[in-house]
Amino acid sequence: MKIKECCTVESQECIAKGIYSMWISTKVIAKEAKAGQFISLFSKDGSRLLPRPISLCEIDREGGRLRIVYRVAGAGTEEFLHLKAGDEVDILGPLGNGFPIEEGKGKRVMLMGGGIGVPPMLQTAKDLGTDTIICCGYRDELFLNEEFAAAGDLHIATEDGSAGVKGNVMDAVREDHLEADVIFACGPAPMLRAIKAYGLEKGIPCWISMEEKMACGVGACLACVCQSTEVDGHSPVSYTHLRAHETLMNL
């Protein structure tokens, strides 16, 4: 069920350069949300008609709260960084398909996140509730690493080599000799392409969350379409979780 709800900001803090963490109190959306889904936040500036899609980092279903971790990338997200406790914000959600947690039950699961694709892996790790392998890739400065370390077996890669393995998440997989039965991943296309190739090579099912520019967030406007081998070229699949080696032509 997707609803538009006026919510209240509980707290917000900067956790890395240009990266912000916000807890939002909701009456309905938190109870319906699943790991890997996202919400759309609406601007109060009338000149910005389209909402901004942001993935869910943590979901407190009993407490009716959502945590988002986002990068300031333009005027819309810059507006959100000024929100403080007690401010109201309109959100639409939950949107997209959550990761198929049942596919990981009783298996060795590796979660792989790159850049701003890192945050949704946190709730995914919590919902799996097992000793999950977590690979996080950063450009330089780390964020959420303490939370991930508490949620599973954390492995880090940084492009500048300042922490963990120098390189990307696939470099960490190879250098740390990591193995898994199932992979869940979210991040930029080059990373997902490398994970797809790895999954094909090893025969590992890979479920991916794609990052695409979008407008409506519900698949009606076709702004987020991606080519697929299983559906026509105009079917919306972004932020839908797909088996990478069976479905995506562009990866």
Where are these regions (language model features)?
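Local cysteine-cluster metal-coordination motifs and their immediate loop/turn environment
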Residues: 212-230, 236-239
